[in-house]
C-alpha cells in the first residue's frame, strides 16, 4: 500500500469501533499489504455488509465476527460450550493485558479443551493469544497453532573469540546480508538444495503436491515482521545438556518459520475445520479437526511436514552463512514455538498446542530471544505440567505495531542501537525495542518453568526492509 490506511479511512466507510479498526489494520498489513488502499477498504466494506459470507475464512472471518449481531435464537444450533470453568494457569498476570487474558478465557470454553496456560509474554493474537498453551484430547485446532506452522528458533555456536568477531565485523555483517532473504517475495539468489525436497511426502496429498515448487523456491528464506537472523555473543554456563564447556562463543541466531508453504497448509485446513462448524461465531476460527478423521490425519501429517520444512529453511540459513564465514559449528540448539505435539500430562495423552510458547519439558533446551537490542536466554525446561511444560517464546509485545510507530521515532531507535553497540540491517520502526516487554521481568515470572543456562547478546541484526 502506497500510503498507510488511517482510522479516518475506516470511519468514512462506517467502521467506527477502535477495536475493529485496529484488528482490520493489523490483518490487512500482514496478509494484504500488496493490495491498494482502495481494494482493502472495499474488502472491509464488503465484510461489513455481508459478514456471514466471510465467517469460514480463516483470516477474514476474524474481522467478520466484529460485525456479527448475535441472535439468541441461534443458540440451540451451536455446540454446547463448557458450563464449568476449566482452570487456566497464568504465569506473570501483571504483564498480560486484559484483552489477551479474555481472549484465552474465551478459548477455554471450547468443549474439547482440557487444560490451558498463559505465559508471561502473552499478548493479543489471531484466534489465540501469542504465548499460549492449550491441551485437547485427540483433536487439533489449526488456528491455535497459527499461520506460521513451525515458527522456530535455532542457534549455532562457533568457537571463535569476541576479538576475532570485532576484527572481522564487516565480514560477519556481509555474511548475513548476502545469504539471507526476508519478506513475501524474497528468495535466496542461488539455488538451495536440501534432502527435504527429495522426500516422497509431497505425493501424500494434492495440496502438498501443489506446494512443492513453492517450498523449493522459498527454501532458506525468512518471513517479515519479527523474523530475524543475527550474530551475537553467547555466554554459556556449565551444564551437561549443552554438551560444550562453559565460556564465551560467537553465535548465529535465526527466527522464522515455514513461509508460504506452511501458511497455505494452515489456511486450507482452517477452512476445512470452520466450514460447517456449529461453534458460536465468536469461536468459529478455533474449530477443530478430529484426529480419527481423514481431514484430521491429513492436517497432522501436513503440519509435521511444514515443521520439517521450517527446520530445512533454518538448516540452509546456518549452512549458507557459515560457509561464507568459513566457520565450523560446534553446537546447535533449536525449538519450534508454533506447533502441536502429542504429550503425556498426568498419565494421559493430550494434543498440546503451543502458539508462541517454547517447549519446556524436563531438561529440554530452548531459546527465548529478547529484542533487537536486549539479550535473550538459552533455557532448560523443568517439565512443569501446570504450564503444559511450556515457557514464553520471547519478551512479548508491550505495544502494538501502530502504537510503537506513533510513540517512537527512527532517530530514537537509532540512538538506542548505537548506545548498545548493535548494527541493524533492515528492520522497521514497529520492531523497535520499545515495542517489547522487559525480558528480565518476563523471566522472573517463569523461574518455575525453566532454568537459564546461557545468554545471547545481539551484535548484528538482519531483518526485513533493507535501508
Label each PLM-derived region with a short phrase.
Residues 1-67:
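Charged substrate- and nucleic-acid-binding regions of tRNA-handling and nucleotidyl-transfer enzymes
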Residues 7-9, 13, 96, 100-101, ...:
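Charge-biased, low-complexity intrinsically disordered regions
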Residues 141, 146-164:
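Catalytic-core region of right-hand nucleic acid polymerases
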Amino acid at each position: 500500500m502506497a500510503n498507510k490506511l488511517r482510522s479516518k479511512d475506516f470511519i468514512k466507510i462506517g467502521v467506527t469501533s477502535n477495536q475493529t479498526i485496529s484488528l482490520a489494520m493489523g490483518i490487512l498489513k500482514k496478509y494484504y499489504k500488496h493490495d491498494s488502499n482502495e481494494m482493502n477498504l472495499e474488502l472491509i466494506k464488503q465484510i461489513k455488509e455481508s459478514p456471514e459470507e466471510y465467517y469460514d475464512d480463516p483470516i477474514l472471518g476474524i474481522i467478520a465476527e466484529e460485525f456479527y449481531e448475535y441472535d439468541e435464537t441461534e443458540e440451540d444450533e451451536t455446540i454446547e460450550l463448557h458450563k464449568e470453568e476449566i482452570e487456566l494457569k497464568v504465569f506473570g498476570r501483571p504483564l498480560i493485558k486484559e484483552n489477551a487474558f479474555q481472549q484465552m478465557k474465551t478459548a477455554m470454553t471450547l468443549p474439547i479443551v482440557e487444560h490451558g496456560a498463559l505465559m508471561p509474554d502473552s499478548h493479543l493474537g489471531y484466534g489465540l493469544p501469542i504465548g499460549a498453551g492449550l491441551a485437547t484430547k485427540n483433536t487439533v485446532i489449526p488456528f491455535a497453532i497459527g499461520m506460521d506452522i513451525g515458527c522456530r528458533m535455532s542457534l549455532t555456536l562457533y568457537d571463535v573469540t569476541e576479538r576475532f568477531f570485532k576484527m572481522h565485523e564487516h565480514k560477519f555483517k556481509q555474511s548475513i546480508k548476502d545469504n539471507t532473504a526476508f519478506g513475501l517475495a524474497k528468495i535466496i539468489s542461488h539455488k538451495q538444495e536440501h534432502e527435504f525436497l527429495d522426500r516422497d511426502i509431497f505425493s501424500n496429498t494434492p495440496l502438498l503436491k501443489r506446494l512443492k515448487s513453492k517450498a523449493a523456491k522459498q527454501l532458506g528464506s525468512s518471513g517479515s515482521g519479527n523474523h530475524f537472523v543475527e550474530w551475537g555473543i553467547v555466554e554459556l554456563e556449565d551444564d551437561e545438556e549443552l554438551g560444550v564447556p562453559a565460556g564465551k562463543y560467537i553465535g548465529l541466531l535465526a527466527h522464522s518459520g515455514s513461509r508460504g508453504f506452511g501458511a497455505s497448509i494452515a489456511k486450507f485446513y482452517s477452512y476445512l475445520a470452520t466450514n460447517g462448524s456449529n461453534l458460536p461465531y465468536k469461536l468459529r476460527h478455533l474449530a477443530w479437526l478430529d484426529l480419527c478423521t481423514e481431514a484430521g490425519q491429513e492436517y497432522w501429517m501436513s503440519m509435521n511436514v511444514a515443521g520439517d520444512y521450517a527446520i530445512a529453511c533454518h538448516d540452509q540459513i546456518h549452512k549458507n552463512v557459515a560457509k561464507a564465514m568459513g566457520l565450523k559449528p560446534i553446537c546447535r540448539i533449536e525449538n519450534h514455538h508454533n506447533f502441536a505435539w502429542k504429550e503425556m500430562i498426568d498419565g494421559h495423552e493430550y494434543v498440546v498446542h503451543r502458539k508462541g510458547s517454547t517447549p519446556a519439558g524436563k531438561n529440554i533446551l530452548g531459546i527465548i530471544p529478547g529484542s533487537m537490542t536486549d539479550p535473550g536466554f538459552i533455557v532448560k525446561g523443568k517439565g512443569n505440567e501446570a504450564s503444559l511444560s511450556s515457557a514464553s517464546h520471547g519478551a512479548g509485545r508491550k505495544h502494538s505495531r501502530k502504537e510503537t510507530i506513533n510513540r517512537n521515532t527512527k532517530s530514537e531507535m537509532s540512538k538506542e542501537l548505537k548506545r548498545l553497540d548493535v548494527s541493524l540491517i533492515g528492520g522497521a520502526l514497529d520492531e523497535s525495542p520499545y515495542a517489547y516487554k522487559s525480558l528480565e521481568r518476563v523471566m522472573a515470572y517463569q523461574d518455575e518453568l525453566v532454568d537459564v543456562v546461557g545468554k545471547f547478546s545481539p551484535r548484528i541484526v538482519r531483518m526485513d526492509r533493507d535501508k
